[in-house]
Amino acid sequence: MADITDIKSIVYTEKALNLQEQGVLVVQTTPKVTKNQLKEIFKEYFGVTPLKVNSLRQKGKVKRFRGIEGKRPDYKKFYVKLPEDAKLESLSV
């Protein structure tokens, strides 16, 4: 079962901020979280039932540092459509 600690961060890019005006929140999580689990997290911790949840898997970038190749961890990104009357004060910019 997923919980609030599986949410790594809220994404604040230019695209994400434009989507936020339309009521869509972009969330980065661990790869094991599913759409239904994320809906339950939003219901339990934020008291909001998402209207729609879209997800995508993102591969971690391969990076080099002083000739040694490393890899950033893989993650999952969710686009969460919230109701118009929903306000998440703790998550807004």
UniProtKB/Swiss-Prot annotation:
<dbReference type="GO" id="GO:0019843">
    <property type="term" value="F:rRNA binding"/>
</dbReference>
<dbReference type="GO" id="GO:0006412">
    <property type="term" value="P:translation"/>
</dbReference>
<comment type="similarity">
    <text>Belongs to the universal ribosomal protein uL23 family.</text>
</comment>
<keyword id="KW-0699">rRNA-binding</keyword>
<dbReference type="GO" id="GO:0005840">
    <property type="term" value="C:ribosome"/>
</dbReference>
<dbReference type="Pfam" id="PF00276">
    <property type="entry name" value="Ribosomal_L23"/>
</dbReference>
<keyword id="KW-0687">Ribonucleoprotein</keyword>
<comment type="subunit">
    <text>Part of the 50S ribosomal subunit. Contacts protein L29, and trigger factor when it is bound to the ribosome.</text>
</comment>
<keyword id="KW-0694">RNA-binding</keyword>
<dbReference type="InterPro" id="IPR012677">
    <property type="entry name" value="Nucleotide-bd_a/b_plait_sf"/>
</dbReference>
<dbReference type="InterPro" id="IPR013025">
    <property type="entry name" value="Ribosomal_uL23-like"/>
</dbReference>
<dbReference type="InterPro" id="IPR012678">
    <property type="entry name" value="Ribosomal_uL23/eL15/eS24_sf"/>
</dbReference>
<protein>
    <recommendedName>
        <fullName>Large ribosomal subunit protein uL23</fullName>
    </recommendedName>
</protein>
<dbReference type="GO" id="GO:1990904">
    <property type="term" value="C:ribonucleoprotein complex"/>
</dbReference>
<comment type="function">
    <text>One of the early assembly proteins it binds 23S rRNA. One of the proteins that surrounds the polypeptide exit tunnel on the outside of the ribosome. Forms the main docking site for trigger factor binding to the ribosome.</text>
</comment>
<keyword id="KW-0689">Ribosomal protein</keyword>
<dbReference type="GO" id="GO:0003735">
    <property type="term" value="F:structural constituent of ribosome"/>
</dbReference>
